[in-house]
Amino acid sequence: MENLISPEEVASMAFAPLDHITTDDINPLTIACVQERFIVPILGEAMIEALLRGDYADLADKWVCPALALYTRALMMPALALRTGAAGVSKVSNQYLDAATENELRSLRRSTLAQATTLLRKAVARIESAPDRYPEYDPRMNIWRRCRIDGGVVV
């Protein structure tokens, strides 16, 4: 499946300029995994295909793509804090910056996931408020209608 957003879009939507994240830091495979893990189970394959065709550009630009970018950022955080090389795995640090603690990383990741989920919930609310406008969306396929996780608890 094609990605809804590019590494360039992830860099511009989910990271601040001072984060110094380049498109080389963002693997398209990570975006694809995030899209399959977080977006497809909510919106469904047919809706994703419609978004890829350019249908519903307003919905994609305002809610779905920013959510995908933030989910991608959250999934990238451990990889950004650690580097894998011939010598093994090492923590990123330099003389000017200290690496974040595990607690700080967890807190930032949780906050980023919450922002992404809020955007995706807004997209779903907009879609479900006008079902005739979005015929590709099948609410029965939305996993949030069957299972929800709030604060790490399955509801």
Question: What do these predicted regions represent?
Answer:
Residues 103-123:
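Amphipathic alpha-helical coiled-coil segments
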Residues 94-105:
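Eukaryote-specific, cytoplasm-facing alpha-helical/coiled-coil scaffolding segments in long proteins
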